[in-house]
């Protein structure tokens, strides 16, 4: 009976005229077998080489349109940006983000425009990012001190970076450290593990019983309840504290919760108001998107440097020359690190943290003569575009020099390089995330020389990927630090 119901609910893309080409399908499950094996972004790139840069897959009941070229990405994210301005909802977003009311997954409309404006103008503006410099600086110095205390020993740098970025985000959001902070971060990590990849229940939305059969609903709800309880405690603490008229905590800087609570208070003159559930959803967004993306990028950058000692030395020489010439480390120093910025750009090309950018087609449209059905899920494969020889010479070779004096960057105007997306749905936290990435890398390179553990050759360093909310390095990066320059004073 269940199979009969599923077959009845299946869309039949072959009966849709002019739909993009795609691979063979099986009854009920459709094209799912094609994604078994390699990580999805690599499988989809291989399929695109056979079926073209605009293709369709039938995954269960859902039609997917796969975009694998800069030209078609521009059609989706610029020419028809409004048509593709929503994101598909899922079990994960509905539970964790309170009915998809966060910034990243809320449907395109008035609510999304308002929360996006709050994010761009107040939460993650360049001014706000600059104001968080003392937190970043203090926490990175703490990390440097901890690593220095283990000089000559093997340090799990992946774990250290992960903890650092989550701590920076916690302090930025909460204003201070809380006893519950570590438990909250632990829950966020568990949620990210669960949310990676394709959830079978989302591919058969009419079969709600799959949510219970796979136990995904109960797992998400359990973690969400724990995180909700912790956030409730922290928000109540903020409300209890004395605040000025503008909502700033007396005797301290305004944190992200303070900013959001200004929109919860109906007695203010704000034209737009947020519920506590909305505020929690936005905070989850900042943690899940901001922290994981930054940590993943730092980890890949250090791994690629260790893979090629010549590139590592180039990056170290630049950092040390500029820091020593200026005699201090501040954001103007970071701005001068041209080679490091090029290196990060190359990391984002070959290791985009989120290689599959999800959009939803709000209404049927046509792209280059192909019919794109309403409610179909569109995936822009930024990894496929970033490794296409049409746009990049020797695309599989790691070469930071390709970005030196190049006009191409990661801010969504160059469709051959889209690590953070483009258009209305471009990642709003780019400035926040890159500020963390650049400072951490600069200080790790300045203060330490790095070597691999005994028995591991540079060229043999394992760069195997693990697909999740982000595509991270599967094996933790473990290195041996040796102090090169004086540590910051405590």
UniProtKB/Swiss-Prot annotation:
Its EC number is 1.14.-.-. Signal peptide: none annotated. GO terms for molecular function: heme binding; iron ion binding; monooxygenase activity; oxidoreductase activity, acting on paired donors, with incorporation or reduction of molecular oxygen. The keyword Lipoprotein does not apply. It is an enzyme of class 1 (oxidoreductase). Keywords: Heme, Iron, Metal-binding, Monooxygenase, Oxidoreductase. Heme binds at residue 427. It holds the Pfam family p450. InterPro entries: Cyt_P450 (IPR001128), Cyt_P450_CS (IPR017972), Cyt_P450_E_grp-I (IPR002401), Cyt_P450_sf (IPR036396). Gene3D superfamilies: Cytochrome P450. Its cofactor is heme. Belongs to the cytochrome P450 family. This is Cytochrome P450 71D11. It comes from Lotus japonicus. The lineage of its organism: Eukaryota, Viridiplantae, Streptophyta, Embryophyta, Tracheophyta. The gene is CYP71D11.
């Amino acid at each position: 009976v269940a199979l009969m119901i599923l077959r009845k609910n299946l869309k039949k893309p072959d009966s849709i005229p002019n739909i993009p080409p795609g691979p063979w399908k099986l009854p009920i499950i459709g094209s799912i077998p094609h994604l078994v094996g390699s990580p999805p972004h690599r499988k989809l790139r291989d399929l695109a080489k056979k079926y073209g840069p605009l293709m369709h897959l039938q995954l269960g009941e859902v039609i997917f349109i796969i975009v694998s070229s800069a030209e078609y990405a521009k059609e989706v994210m610029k020419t028809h940006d409004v048509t593709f301005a929503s994101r598909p909802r899922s079990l994960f977003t509905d539970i964790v983000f309170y009915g998809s009311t966060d910034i990243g997954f809320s449907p395109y409309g008035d609510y999304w425009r308002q929360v996006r404006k709050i994010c761009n103008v107040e939460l993650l503006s360049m001014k706000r990012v600059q104001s968080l410099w003392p937190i970043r600086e203090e926490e990175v110095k703490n990390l440097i001190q901890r690593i220095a205390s283990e000089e000559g020993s093997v340090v799990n740098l992946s774990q250290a970076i992960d903890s650092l970025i989550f701590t920076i985000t916690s302090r930025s959001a909460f204003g201070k450290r809380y006893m519950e902070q570590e438990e909250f971060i632990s829950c966020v990590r568990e949620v990210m593990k669960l949310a990676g990849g394709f959830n079978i229940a989302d591919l058969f939305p009419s079969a709600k019983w799959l949510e219970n059969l796979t136990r995904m609903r109960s797992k998400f709800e359990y973690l969400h309840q724990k995180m909700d309880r912790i956030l409730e405690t922290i928000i109540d603490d903020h409300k209890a504290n004395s605040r000025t008229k503008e909502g700033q905590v007396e005797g301290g800087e305004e944190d992200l919760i303070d900013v959001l609570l200004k929109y919860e208070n109906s007695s203010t003159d704000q034209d737009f108001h947020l519920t506590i559930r909305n505020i929690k959803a936005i905070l989850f967004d900042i943690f899940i998107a901001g922290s994981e993306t930054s940590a993943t990028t730092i980890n890949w950058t250090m791994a690629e440097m260790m893979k090629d000692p010549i590139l590592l030395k180039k990056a170290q020489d630049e950092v040390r020359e500029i820091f020593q010439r200026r005699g201090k480390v501040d954001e103007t120093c970071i701005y001068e690190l041209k080679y490091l910025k090029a290196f990060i750009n190359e990391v984002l090309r070959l290791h985009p943290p989120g290689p599959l950018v999800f959009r939803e087609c709000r209404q049927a449209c046509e792209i280059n003569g192909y019919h794109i059905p309403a409610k179909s899920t569109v995936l822009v494969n930024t990894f496929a575009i970033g490794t296409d020889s049409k746009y990049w010479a020797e695309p599989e070779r790691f070469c930071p020099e390709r970005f030196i004096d190049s006009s191409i960057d990661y801010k969504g105007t160059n469709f051959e390089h889209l690590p953070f997306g483009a258009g209305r749905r471009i990642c709003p936290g780019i400035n926040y995330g890159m500020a963390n990435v650049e400072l951490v890398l600069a200080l790790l390179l300045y203060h330490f020389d790095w070597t691999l553990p005994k028995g591991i050759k540079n060229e043999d360093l394992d760069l195997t990927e693990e697909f999740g909310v982000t595509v991270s390095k599967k094996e933790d990066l473990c290195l041996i630090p040796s102090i090169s320059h004086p540590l910051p004073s405590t």
